[in-house]
Amino acid sequence: MYEVLMFDGGVYRINELYELVEDIGGFVIQKTQLQVAITVTIAIPSEDRPIIESKTKELGGKLVEVPLAGTEIAVVAPTLGRHHMPHPVCDIAEHLRRYGAITVVMGLARGKGRETAQITADEMAFIEEYDAAIFVLGNFADCIMKEKVRLFEDIEVPVIVVCGPNISSLPNCEAVVCGVGRKAERMRHADEIAKLEETALAVEAAIFKRRNIIDEDPLCVHPAEVKQRVDELESVRQSLRPSPVVLHLDGLRVKVPYDQCKDMLRDIDIFGRKLGDLTTIAPSRLGGSTMIRILTTAQLQTRDNAQSSS
C-alpha cells in the first residue's frame, strides 16, 4: 500500500531524493519550487517510509503528513454571488490545500432562495467527478433542514455540510460542521481556525472511509503509477494549465481535451497492458479535460472474461 507524504526543504541535492523514491518503487506526484525552497509530494510503499525519513533528515528537510494528497475536492456554494460567496468558502478551499488536496470552488446556477434553490443533473454529474464535496450553506437552520438538503440528496460522492446554525445531523451527508455561516471577513481568529481544522478532519474521515471501501476490491493499478506514464505524453508536457494531471482516489483528471489525447492515453503501456484495457476514459464535464477511471481487480477480471468468451 502506498503512503503519500510531502517533502519540504531546499533544492540542494534534491535529485538524490527523486532517485531514492524511484529505487524503492515510489512516485513523485507533484513538485512546487520557489527559488531555493521546494515541496515535493511523493507516493511511497508504507514499509519504506524509514528510508525516506533518513534521507529527508540528511537533506535538512522535513516530511509533512498530507492525508488528503491524491484527492480533488469540490467546495460548493449555492451561488457565486456575494450573498452566498463569503470568505469562508475560499478559506475552506485554501485550508484543505494545506492537507494536500486539490480544491475547486463552484456555485450552483440557481441556488438563490430557499424554495427556488435547485441543482441540475449536469451540476450533479460535475460534482460527482470529484472525490468529495463540501456544501457551504447559510445561517438559517429551517432553510437548510427543510429546503437546502435537496441540493445534495442524490449526490453519490461523500458530502460534508458546513453551516452556521447548530445542526446535529443531516440526511445524505457524512458530517455537519456547524458555526461557520456567512461572514464578511476572513477566518483568522483562533476559534475560526479551529472550525477550518474541524472541516478538514471531517473531510479526512470521509476520504479514509472511501479509501477503505476501495481497498476491499483494490484498483488494478495505482493512480500514481498511471500518472507517471501520462506525464510523459507530449500534449501533457505542453499543457500550460496548473497541475495538468490531478490524482483521484480511483483515477486521474488529465487537463487535455479528450479528442486530442484519447488515443494516446489508451495506447499507454502499463506493465505490459494498454491503459485502455485497465480503465474507462471519457471526456470530463470540466471543459478541456479528460477523466480516467481505473477498474478494480474484479471489474478487470469481468471485462477480461467477457472479451475471452466473445
Which sequence ranges carry the predicted segments?
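A short, flexible N-terminal coil/short beta segment enriched in small residues
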Residues: G61-G100
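C-terminal, charge/polar-rich interaction regions
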Residues: V246-S310
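Short glycine-/aliphatic-rich beta-strand segments at the starts of folded cytosolic domains
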Residues: M1-G9, I38, A74-A77
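Helix-enriched interaction subdomains in cytosolic or periplasmic regions
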Residues: I24-K55
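Short amphipathic alpha-helix segments
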Residues: D8-I29, I52
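Long, charge-rich C-terminal accessory regions
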Residues: I92-H95, Y99-C261
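Generic non-transmembrane alpha-helical segments
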Residues: E16-I24, K55, L59, H95, ...
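Conserved short beta-strand edge segments in small beta-sheet-based binding/regulatory domains
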Residues: L5, F27-Q33, S54-V75
